[in-house]
From Swiss-Prot:
This is Poxin. The keyword Hydrolase applies. InterPro entries: Poxin_vir. It comes from Bombyx mori. It catalyses: 2',3'-cGAMP + H2O = Gp(2'-5')Ap(3') + H(+). It is an enzyme of class 3 (hydrolase). Keywords: Hydrolase, Nuclease. Its EC number is 3.1.-.-. Nuclease that cleaves 2',3'-cGAMP. Transmembrane segments: none annotated. The keyword Chloroplast does not apply. GO terms for molecular function: 2',3'-cyclic GMP-AMP binding; nuclease activity. Belongs to the poxin family. Highly divergent.
Length: 255
């Protein structure tokens, strides 16, 4: 009987320790250092995510909180926060558990495009990255050497994680709509979320659009992928804004 109790206690301790991790892998990789970074672990729709204070990824926020948080947050793409985040430096520390963190180097040359919608703003940012073989969950805190929160994990491409901050090319559209991601069609001429086989067909489409415009808040932000990625804002079929993006990864995984 004692053996069973001891086994149960060991399993409970292991489960408790696992629950405090902000990585999915058990064996930590990279440069691991002793560092205490607070975080709370949550679960929504069967997926774990973390938060630190008021800071959490927008795409993890429960729907009933979106409108409330959008009114009061500072506008970092992909991140809700009631406080200003610490500025980005050359080094950062990414939380592994309550006692350890991975030391990483910020890469400003390799950038990931992240987008977010909170019901008020549709934001985009060409974010710097860090590389790690660890499998972090969304919301994992990223801090500077003094423990100030720089950002939280939002998205990645393979082993490269985006670091959302005020650094990097970015902006926003005032829109209540979510981003629409469009896969590029082979050849043709892009306009908003559509692709036309010829310039003549494109001109005919534009000429046929009605003169009046709907409410600006109904405009749809569009991300077109491919080798020549671009952003657009579309209202009633009319392209109101169009941005070409260069040297940025757009095919990313939101955690």
């Amino acid at each position: 009987m004692t053996g069973i109790v001891e086994l149960d206690l060991r399993m409970l301790k292991k489960k408790t320790a696992m629950s405090k991790r902000t990585v999915l892998n058990e064996n930590y990789k990279g440069i691991v250092e002793s560092m205490s970074i607070p975080a709370e672990i949550h679960e929504r729709n069967g997926k774990k995510y973390a938060s630190v204070g008021s800071i959490l990824p927008i795409h993890c926020c429960p729907p009933e909180e979106l409108e409330r948080r959008a009114e009061s947050t500072h506008h970092y793409c992909g991140v809700f926060t009631d406080e200003l985040l610490a500025p980005l430096e050359e080094l950062a520390y990414v939380r592994l558990d309550e006692n350890t963190a991975e030391k990483v180097f910020i890469n400003r040359a390799k950038r990931i495009l992240i987008v977010s919608s909170d019901g008020h703003l549709a934001q985009w940012r060409c974010a710097p990255t860090f590389e790690s073989a660890n499998r972090y969950i969304a919301g994992t805190p990223i801090v500077d050497q003094r423990g100030g929160v720089i950002s939280v994990v939002v998205a990645k491409k393979n082993n490269h994680y985006a670091v959302s901050s005020f650094e990097g090319e970015g902006g926003y559209f005032e829109s209540t709509q979510n981003w629409k991601v469009v896969e590029p069609a082979a050849g043709g001429y892009a306009y908003g979320e559509l692709t036309f086989p010829s310039r003549t067909a494109l001109r005919e489409h534009v000429a046929g659009l009605r003169g009046g415009a709907g409410a600006w808040g109904d405009a749809v932000p569009v991300l077109r992928g491919g080798t020549s990625p671009r952003l657009a804002l579309v209202l009633d079929g009319r392209q109101l804004a169009h941005y070409y993006l260069h040297n940025v990864i757009v095919d990313v995984e939101y955690l």
